[in-house]
Amino acid sequence: MKYRHPLRDILNRTRSHWDQDHTPSAARWAFGKALQCQTAELGAEVYVGDDGELIVYHTCKSRACPSCGYRANMQWLRERWAALADGSYKGITFTMPDVLWPIFRDNPHLARALPALAASVIQGEASARYGSRVGVMAILHTFNGQLEFNSHVHTMVSGGALSAHSGTWTTRINYNREQLMMAWRRAVIELLRAALRVGVLQANPTAADEMEALLAKQEARWWSIKIQSFKSREHFLRYAGRYVRRPPIAQHRITFIGERSVRFWRKDKKQRRRVYVTCSLEEFIDRWAQHVPERYQHTVRSFGLFAPRPLSQTSDAIFVLLGQKQRLRPKPRPWAVSLKRDFGRDPLLDSTGKRMRWIGRLPPNTYRHTNQ
């Protein structure tokens, strides 16, 4: 069965559950805003044409809203596409043993440090092997196909590097998987040990000796590191864009919403087929809530040559070294332009093809009857 707004429907049905103190404040705020999206609660713009008035309600811009997330994601893709030079890129995914996932779930302040750790590992490897600087874009990813907590970091790394001494561009940089794994494992374990020493680590087991034994055991394990080569930045950006501004589950994956349960599908990569997952509405909301980032938390972070300040200083040089013309940063598209470009329909044209004109704005919580 297809639902027009399945996530909003689930939020409406479970409001008495998630609108409580036990829900993380960021998720509670985001869920509330998502329910107000495109309603009189947020106000509206009023347009008039030969057919009458058109009321266009404001959007919420919440990270839990699939509609707003799509538009924000497309704008992010356009900006990143313009800022990065053409060429090859590498995608490196840093994972960790599943026994460490609950620790980072219960300590989000430590999870926020993982992108910087991953970037430092990559930069250290490039500096040690080539004496060069690379650009790194890191995205903290906290969920799997079942919406369970699974902390890992996706990174996009420039395929080439800028020599720290000669200022020349090295066209190809290769990484040793084992060296990256050992450096990543060491960095994560040291982060947890440092947090344990200063008393900012909340985890089960809580005893310091038990935690140290757990970390020592993970220090002897092999941690999975995945390295991919992308022919262009577009390949990675489209892949990463799914996790940047959108909710952790696409709406088309939800196949059934009942009075007490919800069913959705996930991909089984080993068997190459869809697997259906059924859980209660409350459990679905709880899983979703743990993946909503803090309101002012950056989901994408840039380091090295991609960091904001170095990028402004070295971007011109990189484009010149690669013989490419630098592109201007694209301006945000108005909502009507976005709809026309993405769906082929101009919402501000009336039935006669004439353009409607703006006549005013409705403040929040104002209801107004419209003929359309």
Kindly label every feature range from the protein language model.
Residues 1-372:
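Beta->alpha loop/short-helix hinge microenvironment recognizer with preference
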